[in-house]
Amino acid sequence: MNNYLRKLVEGQHLTEEEMYKAGLLLLNENILESEIAAFLVLLKAKGETAEEIYGLVRALREKALPFSNHIQGAMDNCGTGGDGAQTFNISTTSAFVLAGAGVKVAKHGNRAVSSKTGSADLLEELGVNISSTPNEIDYLLEHVGIAFLFAPAMHPALRRIMKIRKELNVPTIFNLIGPLTNPVNLETQFVGIYKRDMLLPVAQVLQKLGRKQSLVVNGSGFLDEASLQGENHVVLLKDNEIVEMSIDPEKYGFSRVKNEEIRGGNSKENAKITLGVLSGEKSVYRDTVLFNAGLALFANGKTETIEEGIKLAAYSIDSGKALAKLNLLIAASNEKLERVN
């Protein structure tokens, strides 16, 4: 590890292979916590490259719980966190809208790290059992169409690093790579990131991971979601080509909404917001979800255009299909799925 720390101190980038090996060292129980903290802080200070991100993702996916590869067509819509905006759980609420529209959603998430309420906190409050094994997750994806992958359970080797991240209390490379370490073999992905200068590197990593189609967004105000506040910077990965673009919500019929207007709270408050959206209540929360879910449906290839994606998202909610997916997940995740273990 000393060699890698020395390179980072000197401001040198690590190669993909060096980062892969450093990642394996970070997960080794014999490494000192001070070394882990130093590595994360030095890497953040230098700035992460696509090669470094992919190298670490390789190491983490290699050490994650094993999944079968028979699940086809799965998608994740996960933000990196780290934007400090304290918004409600936009991507988690949107996940049920995607599932209601017929997308198979493998939602990878965690408890709150830099926010008040993480996806795991919200889902627990709603009644979802977040403690699912890989076999149970496969079952839920096949029979319910949506499953939650609790990141600490999927990546047991990360327990020490999670503790150190909490103590550091600053965004690190792990905020960037969370959405990229989903152990399910995804075909498509919608990723929100808080760092605009990382749009292209993250898209390049998704390309290396073999995604058929993906959208990476940095929202107005540097939100890690698509924002109704103003222009959103986006990178589209399609047909193995990467295209940079900007998206204005007003073009799609949305009124401007400041990011402060969609702040969330604790898990109970955010659960109320999510249930309101999925029940069809008109609000700025609904519009934000429609925008994000519409973009995700476009990223998935479920629709040919963003406009069609937004319309399909609205249908998923207003038909009751999105809320039905939540209720199905609550019921199925709490069953003893002994038949699949």
Swiss-Prot record:
Pathway: Amino-acid biosynthesis; L-tryptophan biosynthesis; L-tryptophan from chorismate: step 2/5. PANTHER family: ANTHRANILATE PHOSPHORIBOSYLTRANSFERASE. The gene is trpD. This is Anthranilate phosphoribosyltransferase. NCBIfam families: trpD. GO terms for molecular function: anthranilate phosphoribosyltransferase activity; magnesium ion binding. 5-phospho-alpha-D-ribose 1-diphosphate binds at residues 79, 82-83, 87, 89-92, 107-115, 119. Binds 2 magnesium ions per monomer. Catalyzes the transfer of the phosphoribosyl group of 5-phosphorylribose-1-pyrophosphate (PRPP) to anthranilate to yield N-(5'-phosphoribosyl)-anthranilate (PRA). Gene3D superfamilies: Nucleoside phosphorylase/phosphoribosyltransferase catalytic domain, Transferase, Pyrimidine Nucleoside Phosphorylase, Chain C.
